């Protein structure tokens, strides 16, 4: 285990919807990579308990997706609160990356950050203010070299840990085919 300000923190959340004022975080996962995108460690993967009233706020897409993935059942069985998730995630990150050093990394990560800001501000403050958003590169590729998108596909399980693995693999793909650095 090597703490480094060059390590990158990848995070993914699953939520009951898209509005942090109405919806809740239902799953969180983190991965730390080095600057070359080699996975150093996987953090806690936590389904966060929510009431039936909160789960009822999910639209059909969320209900179907999170039920089919098994996440809804994990949420119902979970004893973890948001505070537990914050505490465990920060304890993991402190072993790998100094506070404020890593940008928040992921796909459409601005949405996750909005939820962290509202529901887990202590964790949100652990990240540098910058973003490493893989979806930005995807959008540029879609416009400038759309043929390259055919060479990569994600699992799309909508489980937090799987989604992070997809994001890291996608950025590796872009590095190899676009950046050639």
Swiss-Prot record:
Q: Which GO terms describe its molecular function?
A: 3'-5'-RNA exonuclease activity; nucleic acid binding
Q: Where in the cell is it found?
A: Cytoplasm
Domain Exonuclease: start-end pairs:
8-171
Q: What is its EC number?
A: 3.1.15.-
Q: Which InterPro entries match?
A: Exonuclease_RNaseT/DNA_pol3, Oligoribonuclease, RNaseH-like_sf, RNaseH_sf
Name the catalytic site residues: 129
Q: Which UniProt keywords apply?
A: Cytoplasm, Exonuclease, Hydrolase, Nuclease
List, alphabetically, the GO terms of the cellular component aspect.
Answer: cytoplasm
Record Pfam families? RNase_T
| Superkingdom of the organism of origin | Bacteria
Q: Which GO terms describe its biological process?
A: DNA metabolic process
Task: Spell out the PANTHER family in the cross-references.
Answer: OLIGORIBONUCLEASE, MITOCHONDRIAL
State the similarity comment: Belongs to the oligoribonuclease family.
Its biological purpose is as follows:
3'-to-5' exoribonuclease specific for small oligoribonucleotides.
Matching entries from NCBIfam families are given as: PRK05359.1
Output this protein's name.
Oligoribonuclease
- Organism, per UniProt? Photobacterium profundum (strain SS9)
């Amino acid at each position: 285990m090597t703490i480094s300000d060059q390590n990158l923190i990848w995070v993914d959340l699953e939520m009951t919807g898209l509005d942090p004022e109405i919806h809740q975080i239902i799953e969180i996962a983190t991965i730390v990579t080095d600057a070359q995108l080699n996975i150093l460690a996987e953090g806690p993967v936590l389904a966060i308990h929510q009431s039936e009233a909160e789960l009822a706020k999910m639209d059909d897409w969320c209900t179907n997706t999170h039920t089919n993935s098994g996440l809804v059942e994990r949420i119902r069985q979970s004893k973890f609160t948001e505070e537990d998730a914050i505490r465990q995630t920060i304890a993991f990150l402190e072993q790998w990356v100094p506070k404020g050093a890593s940008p928040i990394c992921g796909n459409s990560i601005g949405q996750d950050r909005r939820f962290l800001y509202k529901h887990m501000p202590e964790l949100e403050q652990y990240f540098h203010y910058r973003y490493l958003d893989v979806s930005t590169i995807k959008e540029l590729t879609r416009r400038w070299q759309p043929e390259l998108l055919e060479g990569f596909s994600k699992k799309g399980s909508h489980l937090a840990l799987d989604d992070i693995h997809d994001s890291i693999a996608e950025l590796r793909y872009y590095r190899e085919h676009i950046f050639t650095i």
